[in-house]
Amino acid sequence: MKVSIDKFSKVPVYLQIADQIKSQIISGALPRGSALPSERALAQILDVHRNTVVKAYSELKSDAWIESRQGVGYIVAAANDENDAQDERGGEGAQPGRVNWVSEVAEKYLDMEKTFDDLFQRFTDESHYSLGSGVASREVYTSERVAGDIAALLTGSGPCQYFFSPYKGDKFLRQKLVAFLGTKGVKASSGEIQILSETNQALDFIVTLLVKPGDSVVMEEPVHPDMYRVMELAGAKILTVPVDENGMNCEVLESLLTQTRPRLIFVNSSYHDPTGNILSIERRKKIVELSNRYRVPIMEEDAASELVYDGDKLPPIKAFDTTGNVIYIYSFSLTFIPGLSLAFVTGNRDLIRALSYLVSVRLMASDWMTQKLLGMYLDDGIYYTSLLKFRDVYRTNRDLVCQKLDELAPLGVSYTKPRGGVYVWCRLPDGVDSKRFIRRAYNMGVTLIPGHVFYPCKNGGRDHIRINYSYESYERLGQGMDVLRKALEEELEE
C-alpha cells in the first residue's frame, strides 16, 4: 500500500490518507480482505501522529470501506455496497474473461463522494422523512391538472414535428423567457437564450467551453457538491472564497484576483445552497466591478430568487451587467412540477452561439413536453400564480422548521433564519459530528445532508447539517423534525 501526504495541502492529512486508501480499494490495488498497516506502523511510515491515522481509519470504517477484527487489525471490507456484494456472491464481476470496468474507467469518475448522491436520491423513499433533497413541493401543481394539460398538448392541433424541439430550445418558450427575465431587470433577446434540462447540464456544457485542465476557478465555500465536482472533473483548480451572512466575501475575492487569473467566478447569488444567505445588493455590484476590472467572467447560478418570504426581491447580478461578462443560469427546479426539470442560460451572444453548437453535437433532441408545458404556463399566467402558492407553502414550512430548531436551542443547536429559499444551515451542538449524526438520523427514519460535503477540500462543515423544507408536506415535515430531535438527544446521551 502506497500513501503519500502533502502537509501544505488544504485537505486535512487524515482525509488525504483515507482518500488514497479508498482509491486503491476502488481500483483493486487493495483487494478485499487485504490487511492494512496498524495505526502505529502507518503513523511511523508517514511521520504523523497516531491520532491522524486513527481518524483516517475511522473515516474509512464509517463508510464501510474497511473493518477491524480482534486479533487481526484493519482489513479491506468484504463488500462496500450492493454491487460489491453481488460480486462476492459470484455476480458478473466474478466471471472469468469479463472486462474489469473499475480499472478501465478513468479514476476521477470512480473516486467520488457518495454521501450526497445516496441521500439525495432517497427522497422518493416514503419510509423516510426527506429533509435532504432540494426538490419542488408536490402540493402546487396537482397531478390531475398536469395530466390534463399534457393531454391537451398531445391532442392539440399541429403536425408531429411539434414533438421535437430545436437544439436551442422551443422558440415560443424562449420568447416567454425574455419577458420573465424582464421581471428580474435583465434585458435579453430570444437569440441570447439557450434551453437546457437542468443547472448541472448547463454548468457542464459551459465548463466544457471555457475551462481547460489546470485552469483556476473561484467558487464560494461552502458550495453545492455538484458544482465543484463538475469543475474537478474538468481538471480545474478550485479557489474558494468564504460566504457570510451577506454572501461571497468580496475582499477575499479581490485578493485572489490580484494574485491569479481564474477562468471563472462562480456565484450562487440568491438564498445560497447550503447556507440560505443572500448576496447583498452592494456585493452584487462589487462582484460585477471586479469582473470588469480583472476581465474574469461570472457564472451566476439561480434557482431560488423568486422564493422571497421576508424583505424585497433583489435583481440578479446579471441585471448589473453592462459588459456581457455575466453568464446567468436559471433553474425552475424549485418552482415548477417536481420531476420535470428545465433550466436556461443567457449571456453574451457569441457564448450562447458556441453553447448552442455544443448542445447540437451532444444532444439529438431536448425535452419537448416540459418546454411546451412551461411556455404555456408562462403565457397564460399559471406559472406566476403557482409561484405565489410555492412561496406560501415554503414560507409556512420554513417557519415550522425554525420553530422546531428554536426548541433545540437548549441542546446547543443554532442557525440563522433564512429570508427565502428552501434551506436552513444548522450548526450542531459542540462535539456532534454531522457525518455520524446523519447516519443515526437515517436509521431512525429521516434523511439529512452532512455539512462536510459542501466543502471541496472536506476541511469544514463537520459541525453543520443542511435541512431542506421544500419537498415534504407540512405534517410530514413536522414529524421528520421530531425524529431529528430524538436522534440528536440520543447522540448527546452517548
Model region roles, listed by residue range:
Residues E301:
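Glycine-centered flexible beta-alpha turn that most often forms the glycine-rich phosphate-binding loop
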Residues T155-Y294, E306-L307, D312-F320, Y394, ...:
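Conserved core of the PLP fold type I
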Residues E67-R69, A188, L448:
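Short beta-strand "wing" residues that participate in macromolecule-binding interfaces
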Residues D392-C402, S414-R427:
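Conserved glycine-rich beta-strand-loop-beta hairpin in the small C-terminal domain of fold type I
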Residues T322-D392:
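Conserved core segment of the aminotransferase class I/II
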Residues M1-A151, S360-S366, L388, L400, ...:
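N-terminal basic, amphipathic alpha-helical segments
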Residues Y442-R466:
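Conserved PLP cofactor-binding pocket of PLP-dependent enzymes
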